[in-house]
Structures are given as structure tokens and as C-alpha cells.
Amino acid sequence: MLIFVERVRGKEMVNFNNNYDELAMPGDWIPIVQKLQSQDGTVIVLGKSDSGKTSLIKLLTYFLVKRNRNIGIIDLDIGQSTLGPPATIAMSTVDKKKLKDGNIPIEHMLFIGMISPVGCIDRFLDRICKLYSISQKKKIDTLIVDTTGLVMGSIGIYLKSSLINRINPAALVALQSAQELEPILSQFESRPSLQIYRIKPCQNIVQRSWRDRKLRREKQFCHYFRDSRTREVDFTTTTIRDFNFGLSFCSDNDIVDTIKQKFALEPVYAEKIQNTVVLILQEPQSIPGKDIFINIKKHLQVEQVISIFPHWFQYFLISFNTADGFSNGLGIIKNIDFEKKKITIYMPGSISAENFSEIELGQVRVKPDGTELPYNEPVKF
């Protein structure tokens, strides 16, 4: 089931247009859902990919809203999102009117910039807490949290355990076919304030391949950027946060001049970030030999030099953020002119210059037609 994110009058909307009365609930889910009817607080739903987490949440939402409960939903599944576009986490509230209309406005969205938590766990957890804090200010009886399918191995266990410890939910609903979630659940068995419900995954859930998941994301991106236009942003007047190297987009002219004079290179941008120098070379200049970069490292007394060209940034997904860090929507880099200090961006028509105060540059590459592109590792010396 694919839920497209719509933009209505400048707001993100989730197309929740389904006939719930025709949905069948597996028998062993019914008693759990009935118990959750009187469960105040936060409910985290855990399960590996294709275990039925989203289906359970949709059924649970329908069941509780019909019984006059005020429901909040937080979607943390950045690779297979249902509220916001991929690479984001988002929150909505649901009542009878919204459920009847079939469109649920996204009230808050945060950019993660990746489609897997691996490689950005700290950022992921910090932003989950930020979104959760906002949810606690709303009039919600039950907050339901959808999670990623990353539950196995040391990373999956650490991620889910950290999530539970930070949010401190009232209940966990664990969809497991065997004992795959026990390394997580066993850590919380003795917590008296936490209810743990173990249920079997739905047998009717279609198992999706990696390609199926990629195609689903591409459809979401294509739909999201279907009416995109281009605009230029002056990055001398806009704060830019880069998740790739930590670039500030404020070039160090002293380093640029030094490299031009001593090493006969023509960088259009240079910045020292901790013990690394990032050089952006003028195109179509070819990458010089390794020896030059070894000498640059010695001269600048750094551990690493990264060399890229401006076109390396093409098609990176970005977020237009408000002053408090929430996302007002996504865009795609078309090109960057470091000499003119301009970024040309594909952006949805609903986003205006007044709607954002900073740009975050993610680690996902996608074309406006939705096609996902591989991440090109930069040249490092």
C-alpha cells in the first residue's frame, strides 16, 4: 500500500484514503488492540521489514479514532516512509474528521538526509527526541510510533534500545515471527511502567525486495517533485548545514591562495574541518597526482585532503528549514557555482523564500523524476 505525500495550500498532506471498514484484523491482533484502547501515552511498534508495522498502525489508528481517542502518529521509517517523503521523520494527529476526509496534514517534519539510520544514528536519535518533545505539547491520548525495520545485529539492537530509553514509552508492540526482537525486549522486561505485547506478523503482508523498496521511494520522490521549478539561492545570505563533510560554505581564502601559489592548483573553495581540508577544484580541471595532495597535507598539517568538483553536489537532496530546525519541504541541487556563491535548486512550487531560514544538505542523491542515484565517494588522500 503506497501513501503519497500531497501538498495542499503549502502544507504537506498524507493521502490516507482507504476504506478501513473492509480491512480485516488478524485474530491475535484483536486483544492487543482492545487493550491499547485504554492505554494512554506512547506506543512504539517494533518489527523487522515486512512484518506489518504500518498495517497495524493504520488499523490501530482507525480503531482508536472511532472510539473518540485523540491519536498522534510519528513516522520514523526514513526508508519506507508513510507520512513525509523518504529521508524525513514526521508527525501528524488524527481525529474523526481527518480520517473521514482521507487527508492528514503533516504537522511537523524533520530532515534526516539518509534512507537508513546506519551512518547517522546520533542525528537520527536526536531528531526523534526533538519531534517527540513537540508531540508532548499536543492534546493526544495515544501517540503511536512507527519505526524502521532495522532491529537485527548490534546496530539494530543499539538503535531500538536507545529509542526506547530516550522516549520511555508506555507500551511496546513487538511483531516477531520467532525470537528476533528478544535481544531488545529482554532489556526492558523488568521495567514496571512498560507494557510489552508480543504478536505474530500478519501472514498476508507482501515481502518486498530491495528493488521493490527502491521503486517505492522513487515513486514517492517523483510524486513529490512533480511540479518542481528551479530557483537560485545565495549561500552568502543563507545558512547551509552539510551532512557530508560539515562544510559551512564559507571558503577559507587563505588556504585557497596558498594552494594556488605553492601547488599551482585552482581551487574555487577550500575549508579546514578538524583535521581534514576539503578542496573543491575548478572544472574541467583534472585531479592532479597523489604526490601533490601529500605535500598539501604536510604543508597544511592535516591528516586528510578531500578533493571534489562542483558537479559532485548535483542531485543531492536538501531540506528547507525554519529557524527552529523543522523542515518546510525538500529540494534537489541542480548545480552549485562556488565563484558566484549561488546554488540552483529544484524545489516544489509550494515552498517560497519566506518559508525557510536555512538549508540542510543530505546524503541522498535523487533526480527530479524520482530516480535514485548512487552516492559518489569523494577522492581522499
Q: Which residues does each PLM region occupy?
A:
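Nucleotide-state-sensitive switch-loop elements of NTP-binding domains
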Residues: 22-46, 68, 72-143, 151
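Short, solvent-exposed amphipathic alpha-helical segments in soluble enzyme
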Residues: 62, 88-89, 161-162, 187-191, ...
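Hydrophobic positions on the alpha1 helix immediately C-terminal to the Walker A/P-loop
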Residues: 56, 60
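Phosphate/Mg2+-binding loops and adjacent switch elements
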Residues: 134, 138-200
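The conserved Walker
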Residues: 49
